[in-house]
């Protein structure tokens, strides 16, 4: 993300799309064929970088041709408004434009999730990559036919390899933190040596990254971005949002364990979130244009998340119905749309354009890495503790004299013995 401005101002959309789609085709083929977890992780890192670049390139192209707006001028340092009226006008434009952009991408993301779940359910997980390879070939063909060719206007490429080193250190830090938070419960936290080593690596890599960025003349990441109050508040809001949103896992836990639904049915249930995104997007645009203050919109978003959780609290019961599970999904996604689209608008008020790339990096790091991992670790540990508590509570007076428990235990033991387990 800190490469955002330097990449998009190249203005060679056709070259970047062809190169990006071709590389993603190669990485998808490797993911479909390999059995190495290391290669899968490495290809995922490269594909994440390419997806972000291609998304931004295509977004700026779409804004130009669909909205007849030169988006590059809106992020070029030095082009900031010089008056309060100009900043107010820009804030109103962002309040209306960003919900529409987020609605577009979030609906596409949900469609992609549903499609991948269907492919994995009907066939095998490798077919997800084969399908993606076919789409990439189609994208390459469309790019060849529709996009004009632009010559490179400068001799020097805007990104040097030193900055890729900084980016690698940053990725190592996030990867180590993610490993600790994801596998900590499975490996019994710091009783496992890999968790200890990952923690040490995260601290060392994070320290090196902060030292390099604070001493370089042209840093990869602008640490001064945290001097802005709106950025700090945006960081906090996104952190709270994604930690609270991690409670959505309880819907899948309830439908999977209580209703015995498979992954495809759970993904189908998630399609109702598109209705919530649509409701939230339209409401956000309308209320923003009407000039409703941010504090009321944020309060409405968090209130909807709370209502979704409250619905689940009263709905989790033996007589719970699958058809009623769509309501917490719709309510939560409506609140998500409020907060997802307006937090960036609030955080970037009066923000100099030179900090835009660093803010996007901060936003995605919190929204897609740190907060979801912390939220998932928190809720899974709470869920495990509660499960152990209630299993112990209800099983303490059950023995082999209980006919149903005895039959279930005997069947499980025989099944394990047939599999060669002792």
PLM-predicted stretches and their roles:
Residues 108-120, 181, 284, 374-379, ...:
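Small-residue (Gly/Pro/Ala) motifs that create kinks and tight helix-helix packing interfaces
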Residues 29-32, 140-145, 207-210, 310-313, ...:
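Membrane-embedded alpha-helical segments of multi-pass transporters/permeases
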Residues 20-24, 30, 46, 53, ...:
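Hydrophobic residues within membrane-embedded alpha-helical segments of Major Facilitator Superfamily
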Residues 369-422:
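Hydrophobic transmembrane architecture of multi-pass small-molecule transporters
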Residues 2-8, 14-17, 27, 220-388:
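12-transmembrane solute porter fold
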Residues 121-236:
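Hydrophobic transmembrane-helix bundles of small-molecule transporters
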Residues 16, 97-98, 127-132, 194-198, ...:
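Alpha-helical transmembrane segments of multi-pass secondary-active solute transporters
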Residues 9-164:
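Helix-loop-helix hairpins in multi-pass membrane proteins, especially solute transporters
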